[in-house]
A protein has these predicted regions:
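The canonical Cys-X-X-Cys-His
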Residues: 1-4, 130-141
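Typically the conserved alpha-helix immediately C-terminal to a functionally engaged Cys/Sec
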Residues: 1-18, 146, 151
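Thiol-based oxidoreductase modules, predominantly thioredoxin-like and allied folds used
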Residues: 15-34
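Structural micro-motif
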Residues: 41-50, 315
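A short, hydrophobic beta-strand/beta-hairpin element that forms part of a small beta-sheet core
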Residues: 46-63
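Post-cleavage N-terminal segment of exported redox proteins
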Residues: 80-125, 147
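PDZ/PDZ-like domain segments forming the peptide/carboxylate-binding groove
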Residues: 161-202, 206-209, 267-319, 323-326
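PDZ-domain C-terminal substructure recognizer with occasional recognition of PDZ-binding tails
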Residues: 201, 216-256, 309-312, 318, ...
Length: 367
C-alpha cells in the first residue's frame, strides 16, 4: 500500500497531471475532523479516495482491499480510468443526478469521530494531532463496534462490510475496475447470465466507476436474501441482469481488517507464526501451523487473566478445540472473535519445553 500511495502522490506523472489539471486534490491523513455523513467509505482500507462535486454530490469511490493484500484490487491504470469516468460524470452533471443520488449515505447522528459515543480516549484525541494521537480510519469502525456492544446490538452481520464482487461470483479486472474477467459457476452472477468480458456500468441505478462503487451498493444491501440489478455493456449492446443472492451472501474473510481487533473477546497477546526451520524441529503433523506467544499485554485485564490462568511467553499453540492448528495468526484471531463470547474458555493444546499441555484460555475482560 505504501508503494501505491507513493505512486499516486509523487511518482506517476499521468495521475499527477490529471489531478492538477482537472481536480482539486485534498490529501487527508487522519479522520479527526472529517464529516462522517459526507465521507462514508470502508474505513478499514489502507488507501481510499472519494470524488465529489462542490455541492457535496459523490461521484465515485476508489480503493478495495481483501485478505489477498492491500493492492490486489487497486492499480494506477484503474485509478486513472476511474478519474476519467468521474470527469465524464461531472460533464453530464446535473442531468445525471438521479444516478448519483444513492452514492451519499444516510446522515449519521454525529458529525465527526470525536462526537461518536463509542470513540474511546476522546479527551486525549481532542488534543493536537501527532503520530501517537490521531484518529485512524479503522477507529471509526472500532467506535461503531463499541456503540453496538453498549446498545446490545452486536451481531456478525454488521461485520460483513463492503462485500467484494467475488461474493456475487464476479472477478473484476483490477486494471480496469468495471470489466468482468471471470464469472464463477454456481454464484448469483453466473445464474443471472453475466459473462466474462461484460463491462459493468450501473448497480441498482447507480453509475459505476470502480470496484469500490459496486461495493458501496452491495454494502447497503442486507445479508438476508437480496437482489441487485446490474447494467453492463456486452460488445456494442447494453444488457441488464437481476442477481439473486441467498441469505448469508455477504460473509467473507475479514481477517485482514484492522477493526477486527476491537471486537470482543480480545486476546491481548501477540501470537506469531514461526520460522520454517523451527516448525520442522517440532516434528508436528503435516500442515500444522504453530503460533508462538511472543507477548502478553498485562496492561489489559484480558492479558492479566490469561497470564494468571497459566499462559506463558514462549508457549507454542499447536492445537485448538482438540484439533491441530492449521490457520494463520490473523485467522486464529478471527476464529475466536466469530465463535466465542466474553466469559467462554478457549481450549488449546500448547507445547512448553517440549511437553504438550492442555490450556483453557479464559476469555474474560475484567479482573
Amino acid at each position: 500500500c505504501k508503494g501505491f500511495d507513493a505512486e499516486v502522490a509523487k511518482n506517476n506523472h499521468r495521475i499527477i497531471k490529471l489531478a492538477q489539471e482537472k481536480f482539486v486534490a485534498v490529501r487527508q491523513v487522519e479522520m479527526k475532523g472529517v464529516d462522517l455523513s459526507q465521507f462514508q467509505f470502508d474505513y478499514d482500507l489502507n488507501w481510499a479516495a472519494m470524488f465529489l462535486n462542490a455541492d457535496g454530490t459523490v461521484y465515485a469511490r476508489y480503493g478495495t482491499q481483501s485478505a489477498q493484500g492491500a493492492d490486489a484490487y487497486n492499480s494506477i491504470e484503474s485509478l486513472e480510468k476511474t478519474m476519467r469516468r468521474v470527469l465524464a460524470l461531472h460533464n453530464d452533471y446535473p442531468a445525471n443526478k438521479t444516478a448519483l443520488a444513492g452514492k451519499i449515505g444516510k446522515p449519521k447522528p454525529y458529525k465527526t469521530a470525536l462526537q461518536m459515543p463509542g470513540m474511546k480516549h476522546r479527551t486525549k484525541l481532542a488534543g493536537g494531532t501527532a503520530r501517537n494521537n490521531c484518529v485512524h480510519c479503522h477507529n471509526i469502525h472500532d467506535a461503531e463496534h463499541e456503540q453496538q456492544r453498549a446498545a446490545g446490538r452486536q451481531n456478525h452481520d454488521a461485520l460483513w462490510r463492503y462485500p467484494l464482487p467475488d461474493n456475487l461470483g464476479l472477478r473484476i479486472d483490477p486494471g480496469d475496475g468495471r470489466s468482468v474477467s471471470a464469472v464463477q459457476a454456481g454464484f448469483a452472477a453466473a445464474e443471472a447470465g453475466l459473462q466474462t468480458g461484460d463491462v459493468l456500468t450501473h448497480a441498482d441505478g447507480q453509475s459505476l466507476t470502480s470496484i469500490a462503487d459496486l461495493q458501496w451498493v452491495l454494502h447497503n444491501l442486507p445479508n438476508t436474501s437480496a437482489n441487485v440489478t446490474l447494467k453492463a455493456t456486452r460488445g456494442d449492446r447494453s444488457i441488464e441482469k437481476k442477481l439473486a443472492m441467498n441469505a448469508g451472501w455477504k460473509k467473507t474473510d475479514i481477517s485482514w481488517r484492522g477493526s477486527l481487533w476491537s471486537i470482543k473477546p480480545v486476546l491481548a497477546t501477540w501470537c506469531a507464526p514461526m520460522k520454517e526451520n523451527r516448525v520442522k524441529s517440532l516434528r508436528l503433523a503435516k500442515g500444522v501451523k504453530p503460533l508462538e506467544v511472543r507477548w502478553i499485554n498485562t496492561d489489559r485485564p484480558e492479558g492479566r487473566n490469561a497470564k494468571r490462568a497459566g499462559l506463558r511467553k514462549g508457549d507454542i499453540i499447536i492445537g485448538m478445540e482438540d484439533k491441530p492448528l492449521r490457520m494463520t495468526s490473523q485467522h486464529f484471531n478471527m476464529h475466536v472473535k466469530l465463535n466465542y463470547k466474553v466469559g467462554d474458555k478457549l481450549p488449546l493444546t500448547l507445547l512448553r519445553n517440549g511437553k504438550r499441555i492442555r490450556f483453557d484460555w479464559p476469555l474474560t475482560d475484567r479482573d
